[in-house]
Each structure stands twice: as C-alpha cells, then as structure tokens.
C-alpha cells in the first residue's frame, strides 16, 4: 500500500466525471455558456480560457493552445467518444432493467450522439479560430519580451544590410 496509494484518491486531483462532461457537450447552450463565461477573479485566467473536455481553467491562451495539443487532452477526448458509464450500465450488466438500458443506448445513438459530434466540431472550429493568432511561446519575464523584440529587429536589420551589400 504505502503512502503513494493514497495520493491517487486525493480530492484536489479529482477531475470532473465523464458523464457530466458528456452532458455539457450534448447541448449547444451549455457549450456556449462554458465558452463565454463572465470574468471571475477567483479562477485562473479570470475564467476565460477553459477546456471543456478536461474541465480545466488555463492561465493564458498560450497554455490552452499547448494543452489542446497534449497527450492528456487527447486521451480525455478519446474517452469522451464512447457512451458514458452510468448506473443503468451496471444494472444491465447484472441483468436488471435491460430494456431501459437498451432504450437509453438507442436514444444516445440516434439523437444525443450526432448532436454531440456536431457540437464538438463547432467547439473545435471556435478554438481554432480564437487561438490561431496566439503565439506558441511567451516570455517568462516582462523585460525579456522587449529584449527579444530588439534582438529580432537587430537580426533582420543585419540580414537586410548583408543582402544589400552583396
């Protein structure tokens, strides 16, 4: 057992359950509500940079952009492609309320599933368009940005004088 087995169940590392996120992605209203949140100073990045699939707030748009390319996010999206696990699934596995479970699966495949996929496509388009102009890296210190701009200006000036002299 040991002390590390306890860390797996720590509440501060607990993420939102897949069935709740699946419900968020199933309607356009909930997706729009999560994308256009009001400013909240208690959340990272004032609550403006939110990953719906992972249910996480990011500090900056750059952090959100790198998160969307990461393994953790891609794994979470893959988990959300299937039908979420509910009490009905476990009851059907035990042999109870099998008809109720089959009706639920049919409902998901006919109505909720296609709507969720279209919402995910709209979400991807929205994130691509909003994060298209975001740089992939940011300076760690404020004065480093000014130095980096001065260095790039000096390099381009040196290249232009070198090409003009030849």
UniProtKB/Swiss-Prot annotation:
GO molecular function: nucleic acid binding; ribosomal large subunit binding; zinc ion binding
Locations listed in the record: Nucleus; Cytoplasm
Motif Nuclear localization signal location, chain numbering: 7-16
Any one biological process term the GO annotation gives: ribosomal large subunit export from nucleus
A Pfam family matched in the record: zf-C2H2_jaz
Cytoplasm keyword on record: yes
Key words, A-Z: Cytoplasm, Metal-binding, Nucleus, Ribosome biogenesis, Zinc, Zinc-finger
Zinc finger (C2H2-type): 49-73
Any one cellular-component term (Gene Ontology): cytoplasm
UniProt region (Nuclear export signal-like (NES-like)), positions on chain: 17-31
Gene3D superfamilies named in the record: Classic Zinc Finger
PANTHER family: ZINC FINGER PROTEIN 593
Function, in words: Involved in pre-60S ribosomal particles maturation by promoting the nuclear export of the 60S ribosome. Involved in positioning the proximal bud pole signal.
Family classification: Belongs to the ZNF593/BUD20 C2H2-type zinc-finger protein family.
Oligomer status and interactors: Associates with pre-60S ribosomal particles; released from the pre-60S particle very early in the cytoplasm.
Additional detail: Present with 5630 molecules/cell in log phase SD medium.
Protein name in the entry: Bud site selection protein 20
Organism of provenance: Saccharomyces cerevisiae (strain ATCC 204508 / S288c) (Baker's yeast)
Lineage, top ranks: Eukaryota, Fungi, Dikarya, Ascomycota, Saccharomycotina
């Amino acid at each position: 057992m040991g002390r590390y087995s306890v860390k797996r169940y720590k509440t501060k590392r607990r993420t939102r359950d897949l069935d709740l996120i699946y419900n968020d992605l199933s309607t356009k209203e909930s997706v729009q509500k999560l994308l256009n949140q009001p400013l909240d100073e208690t959340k990272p990045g004032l609550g403006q940079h939110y990953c719906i699939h992972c249910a996480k707030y990011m500090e900056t748009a750059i952090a959100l952009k790198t998160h969307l390319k990461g393994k953790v996010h891609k794994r979470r999206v893959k988990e959300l492609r299937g039908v979420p696990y509910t009490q009905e699934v476990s009851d059907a596995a035990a042999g109870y309320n099998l008809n109720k479970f089959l009706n639920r699966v049919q409902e998901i495949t006919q109505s909720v599933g296609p709507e969720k996929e279209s919402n995910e496509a709209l979400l991807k388009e929205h994130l691509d368009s909003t994060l298209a102009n975001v740089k992939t890296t940011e300076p760690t210190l404020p004065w480093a940005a000014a130095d980096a701009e001065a260095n790039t200006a000096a390099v381009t000036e040196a290249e232009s004088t070198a090409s003009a002299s030849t």
